[in-house]
From Swiss-Prot:
Catalyzes a trans-dehydration via an enolate intermediate. It comes from the Bacteria. Its EC number is 4.2.1.10. The lineage of its organism: Bacteria, Pseudomonadati, Pseudomonadota, Gammaproteobacteria, Alteromonadales. Pathway: Metabolic intermediate biosynthesis; chorismate biosynthesis; chorismate from D-erythrose 4-phosphate and phosphoenolpyruvate: step 3/7. The active site is at 24 (proton acceptor), 99 (proton donor). It comes from Shewanella sp. (strain W3-18-1). It catalyses: 3-dehydroquinate = 3-dehydroshikimate + H2O. GO terms for molecular function: 3-dehydroquinate dehydratase activity. This is 3-dehydroquinate dehydratase. Belongs to the type-II 3-dehydroquinase family. The record marks 19 as: Transition state stabilizer.
Length: 144
């Protein structure tokens, strides 16, 4: 059985490298995904990626995936999207939640997540490296 992981990135992450680099770092999303693709390939795992600023596109991708694991950075949808949470619960695919910044050290409204209580794990505050940690953990979960 081949292993597949879906990487889901929410709104404004397409601006990585330009948007508040002091908070989110200087790497672009393309840079991050390239690193993750290399990591996945070395582990013999397929990585599928979607980034969208539109909630319905993320939901449709989650509904359509045949992945066995999801890594999600819901971005601003973390604090607002019951629909995206319901999509994750509806497909019942285990997932890791990732945030580039330490959301708990930021504004109070960023402290609540609609996903954390259902995630296998939550990784925040490590910048782009957080995705690598999540991918390593997901691969370990899949391969036992």
């Amino acid at each position: 059985m081949s292993h597949k992981i879906l990487l889901v990135n929410g709104p404004n992450l397409n601006l990585l490298g330009r948007r508040e680099p002091s908070v989110y770092g200087h790497q672009t999303l393309a840079d991050i995904v390239a690193t993750l693709n290399q990591q996945a390939q070395q582990a013999g795992v397929e990585l599928e990626h979607i980034q969208s600023n539109a909630e319905f596109e993320l939901i449709n991708a989650i509904h359509a995936t045949d992945a066995q694991m999801i890594i999600i950075n819901p971005a601003a949808f973390t604090h607002t999207s019951v629909a995206l949470r319901d999509a994750m619960l509806g497909v019942a695919i285990p997932f890791f939640e990732v945030h580039l910044s330490n959301v708990h050290a930021r504004e109070a409204f960023r402290h609540h997540s609609y996903f954390s209580d259902k995630a296998i794990g939550v990784i925040c505050g490590f910048g782009a490296q957080g995705y690598e940690f999540a991918l390593s953990a997901a691969i370990k979960q899949l391969k036992g």
